[in-house]
């Protein structure tokens, strides 16, 4: 389950500002340039070694442009730095760009529209459960672990083999 959440594709909605006012044509050209496989060096403050690596931007969509403000939807490979993506787009446009806001709207098969909740909402539901002993809201937020595992392949074994499997027996 953790692998799905960590390594699955992510979707973000981001608001950023570029320092020059791009034409619609130039913006379309840049969006095309940053879609697909890109090279990205993690930002100065990151938890990983700062060496250039490839990341895949599956979809980069301009939702709205209001002068220098760009609202985008980005579907990308795990490990992509969106703040750095905005910086790089700004560098190509000249003289730079910054991300202002970022919201993750999807992790692999888990979509925001399917009932994902914020940590704040979860904390509120937990507080209600603690104070009033009412778990209705909390139980509505908790999903079965099988949901996270649904994309993984499964293996069916005989009941008689369960004990041996639990002690390291080979499948084949």
Regions found by a protein language model. Give the residues of each.
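Glycine/acidic-rich beta-strand-loop module
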Residues: 1-4
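Accessory RNA 3′-end/elbow-binding domains used by RNA modification enzymes
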Residues: 8, 13-15, 30-33, 45-52, ...
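Charged, alpha-helix-enriched surfaces in structured cytosolic catalytic cores
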Residues: 9, 22, 80, 84, ...
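Short beta-strand-to-loop capping motifs
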Residues: 16-20, 74-76
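Short, conserved charged micro-motifs
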Residues: 21-29
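Intrinsically disordered, low-complexity polar/charged tails and linkers
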Residues: 34-37, 85
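Short Pro/Gly-enriched beta-strand edge/turn motifs at strand-loop
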Residues: 38-46
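Aspartyl protease active-site motif detector
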Residues: 73-93
